[in-house]
């Protein structure tokens, strides 16, 4: 699941997420910055990114002395697996759609520029590359289909494994 989180938020934010996973209670952005020896603005930027993806949540209170808001952050433990699982399902759906396109479509490519064209686009351009004018060759989508089949199977297995793990936790 952390690999998917990395794809969503990048290495820097993933490091912060791992740090927060290790925390047992809420922590302020200022405390995080101090502990990680990072600028508070940098920490906030990544916290907001993680929050946008639902991976962390925050609670906001107003400081009585300074009248400023203090944000307390924590990992969204209740939702993190569900969020990442739904992202995997979305990726799986896109891969299946792409597989169907590769399976059902006829494609051409420019051997010079490696640009792929649909059959309709190839006809419209008289089977010439728009970029360099080279004649297009028919594209064998077998490698792409094979790769997509592999990825689809891998993600289906990951999803099923997560579902089994979650259902075993509830008993």
Swiss-Prot record:
Keyword Cell cycle set for record: no
InterPro entries, per the entry: TF_E_archaea, TFE, TFIIE/TFIIEa_HTH, TFIIE_asu, TFIIEa/SarR/Rpc3_HTH_dom, WH-like_DNA-bd_sf, WH_DNA-bd_sf
Domain HTH TFE/IIEalpha-type: 1-81
GO biological process, one term: transcription initiation at RNA polymerase II promoter
Keyword Membrane: no
Signal peptide: none
The entry's keywords: DNA-binding, Transcription, Transcription regulation
SUPFAM superfamilies linked to this entry: Winged helix' DNA-binding domain (SSF46785)
GO terms assigned for molecular function: DNA binding
Domain of life: Archaea
Free-text note on domains in this protein's UniProt record: The winged helix domain is involved in binding to DNA in the preinitiation complex.
Family: Belongs to the TFE family.
Function: Transcription factor that plays a role in the activation of archaeal genes transcribed by RNA polymerase. Facilitates transcription initiation by enhancing TATA-box recognition by TATA-box-binding protein (Tbp), and transcription factor B (Tfb) and RNA polymerase recruitment. Not absolutely required for transcription in vitro, but particularly important in cases where Tbp or Tfb function is not optimal. It dynamically alters the nucleic acid-binding properties of RNA polymerases by stabilizing the initiation complex and destabilizing elongation complexes.
Subunit organization: Monomer. Interaction with RNA polymerase subunits RpoF and RpoE is necessary for Tfe stimulatory transcription activity. Able to interact with Tbp and RNA polymerase in the absence of DNA promoter. Interacts both with the preinitiation and elongation complexes.
Name under which the protein is recorded: Transcription factor E
């Amino acid at each position: 699941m952390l690999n998917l989180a990395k794809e969503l938020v990048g290495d820097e934010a993933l490091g912060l997420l791992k740090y927060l996973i290790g925390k047992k209670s809420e922590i302020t952005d200022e405390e995080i910055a101090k502990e990680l020896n990072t600028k508070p603005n940098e920490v906030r930027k990544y916290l907001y990114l993680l929050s946008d993806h639902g991976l962390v949540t925050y609670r906001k209170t107003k400081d009585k002395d300074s009248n400023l808001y203090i944000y307390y952050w924590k990992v969204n433990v209740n939702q993190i697996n569900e969020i990442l699982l739904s992202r995997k399902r979305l990726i799986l759906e896109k891969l299946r759609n792409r597989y169907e396109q590769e399976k059902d479509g006829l494609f051409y490519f420019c051997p010079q520029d490696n640009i792929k064209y649909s059959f309709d686009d190839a006809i419209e351009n008289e089977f010439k590359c728009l970029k360099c004018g080279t004649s297009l060759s028919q594209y064998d989508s077998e490698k792409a289909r094979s790769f997509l089949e592999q990825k689809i199977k891998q993600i289906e297995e990951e999803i099923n494994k997560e579902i089994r793990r979650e259902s075993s936790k509830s008993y």
